[in-house]
A protein has these predicted regions:
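Conserved acetyl-CoA-binding loop-helix of GNAT-fold acetyltransferases
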Residues: 84, 90-103, 239, 245-258, ...
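Conserved GNAT acetyl-CoA-binding A-motif
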Residues: 105-117, 260-272
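Short, structured interface segments
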Residues: 130-150
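Surface-exposed beta-loop interaction hotspot
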Residues: 147-159
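A short beta-loop-alpha structural element at the N-terminal edge
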Residues: 3-16, 158-171
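Acetyl-CoA-dependent GNAT
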Residues: 10, 18, 22-74, 80, ...
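Conserved active-site alpha-helix within GNAT-family acetyltransferase domains
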Residues: 95, 107, 118-137, 250, ...
Length: 301
C-alpha cells in the first residue's frame, strides 16, 4: 500500500524519535521536541510532514522557512531533517513527501529548497541527486571549538553580553547600515529562534558606551542536517560600519567560542555567500576552514 503524506503533529513525536534512532543510531529527543514546539508557535515558518502506511509512521520531513540568508530574495525552505523507515524505502514515500513539501513551498511564494549533506553520505547524496538538487554556490566553513588565543594588548576588550529580546531594534538599525536593506522581519525571526528555538542560548551583542554596535546570531542544535554531535550554527555576524576594525567582530567570535567550549560543543559552522569576500577573510583569519559538508539547492519553478 502506498504511503499517505500528511502534516506532522505532536502526536507523532514518539514515532519520529524512534524512527530517527533506527536510521541514525542515536535518539534526538530534545531536537525534535524543540522543532515541534517551534512549529506550534510559528506555523507559517515551519513545514513538517509525515508519511504513514496503514496508520503507522514510515517517514518524516522537518523544514523551515529562511528569510533570505541563503541568497534567495523570496526566501528558501531549509530541509533540516528527513527520514524514511529502512523497511519502506524504494516505495516512493520520500519522493511523495518531498513533492508535497515543494507544493507547500510554492504556495508560500518560496523560490528554492536548500539543505546540507556530508560528501560521504552516499545514500543522502543519491536521494538529492534523484530529486534534482544541485550544488549551491555557498561555502560551508567550520571551526573546531577550542579557546582562541588571548589578546595580550593593553586595551580593554569590548563588552560582549548575551542577546536580549529588547535588542531587536538596534540590530535592525546596525544591519541596515551594513546591508543597505531593511531586514527587520528576518532579524525578528532570528532573534526569536536564538532565544526560544535553540537548544542553548548562545547569541551575543557587543556594546560601546552602553549601546549595541555589533551582534552574532547563532544556534546550538543536536540534530540539524543529520548532526549527531553538538554543533553550533553561526547564522549572521555584523558590526556597525562606524565601529569597524575596532575589534568588535573578533570579540564577539572569541566570546562565542569561549561559551561553546564551556558547553562542550564540538564545532561552529556557517554558510558564506561566494561574493562575501571580506567576511570570508575574517572567518579564515579566525581559523575557519572548508567543511566536509556540502550545500545543495533546488530551484522551485
Amino acid at each position: 500500500m502506498d504511503a499517505t503524506v500528511r502534516p506532522l503533529t505532536a502526536a507523532d513525536f514518539d514515532a519520529v524519535v524512534a524512527l530517527d534512532a533506527r536510521i541514525g543510531g542515536a535518539a534526538r529527543c530534545g531536537y525534535f521536541e524543540k522543532r515541534l514546539q517551534a512549529a506550534a508557535r510559528h506555523p507559517r515558518r515551519h513545514l513538517q510532514l509525515a508519511a504513514a502506511t496503514n496508520g503507522a509512521l514510515t517517514g518524516f520531513v522537518l523544514a523551515r522557512k529562511a528569510g533570505g540568508e541563503y541568497g534567495d530574495p523570496e526566501g528558501a525552505v531549509v530541509l533540516e531533517a528527513f527520514g524514511v523507515d529502512p523497511a519502506a524505502r524504494h516505495q516512493g514515500a520520500g519522493r511523495r513527501m518531498l513533492a508535497r513539501l515543494e507544493e507547500l513551498a510554492r504556495e508560500r511564494g518560496i523560490s528554492a529548497l536548500v539543505t546540507q549533506a556530508h560528501w560521504r553520505e552516499h545514500g543522502i547524496l543519491s536521494f538529492l541527486d534523484a530529486a534534482h538538487f544541485e550544488l549551491a554556490p555557498r561555502r560551508i566553513l567550520e571551526l573546531p571549538v577550542q579557546r582562541l588565543p588571548v589578546d595580550d594588548t593593553d586595551a580593554p576588550p569590548p563588552l560582549v553580553r548575551n542577546l536580549r529580546e529588547g535588542d531587536l531594534e538596534s540590530l535592525v538599525r546596525i544591519d541596515e547600515r551594513i546591508t543597505g536593506q531593511d531586514r527587520g522581519d528576518f532579524l525578528k525571526a532570528k532573534v526569536d529562534e536564538a532565544l526560544h528555538d535553540s537548544a542553548i542560548q548562545v547569541s551575543l551583542v557587543a556594546e560601546d558606551d552602553g549601546f549595541p554596535v555589533g551582534f552574532a546570531m547563532a544556534r546550538v542544535d543536536f540534530g540539524d542536517f543529520g548532526h549527531l554531535g553538538a554543533c553550533a550554527s553561526l547564522d549572521t555576524i555584523g558590526v556597525d560600519p562606524r565601529f569597524a576594525r575596532h575589534g568588535f567582530a573578533g570579540a564577539l567570535l572569541g566570546q562565542m567560542i569561549e561559551n561553546l567550549a564551556a558547553l562542550h560543543v564540538e564545532r561552529l559552522e556557517t554558510e558564506v555567500a561566494p561574493d562575501a569576500l571580506e567576511l570570508q577573510r575574517f572567518l579564515q583569519r579566525s581559523g575557519f576552514t572548508p567543511s566536509q559538508r556540502v550545500a545543495f539547492r533546488k530551484a522551485l519553478r
